[in-house]
Amino acid sequence: EGKWGGEVKDRPILFSGPMVRAIREGRKTQTRRLIKFEWSGSREALMHQATFDPAYKCPYGKPGDRLWVRETWGLMANHDVTDWFRDSIVGIPESELRELYLVEHAANWRIPSESAYWRPSIHMPRWASRITLEIVSLRVEKLQNISNEDCWNEGMCDATNPERKANRKWFSELWESINGLGSWDLNPWV
């Protein structure tokens, strides 16, 4: 049982490379996701659903549940092969061996024929995930109601903006890079 009550559940969630880096650097502590309504046919039901009654169930869980992050990943060798390789042939110190994740290397390093190694985030199994996040709160709002502080909590990094002035333009560009051109202007519920 979780500290918020009820059984704790783990669910997967996809993040892009830049957002995984922001999570690992401690810059991203919030995420906004489109609300996908399942409308029923009656007028009363539509009115009820439009008021965002607390009965709306978030598909990612409730406070206390965990989200395991799916990111682009690759299996270079299993531990048996790594141990044999290290001990028998090369003698590489343990401190120099580590797992590889594309998000850390995308900017300055490539494996030859990388398509043979890297797998899309959607196919990442639970055991390969290195980041688990806990849901601490949920809220529903219109996308463009994002506050200045929330822009930063979405992972904004701008060294030219040391006063942390809001940059809604940055967030709107991030949103459209994920959800398509014009998606910011639609101002959906998130």
Task: Set out the residue ranges of the language-model regions.
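Secondary-structure transition motif
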Residues: 1-190
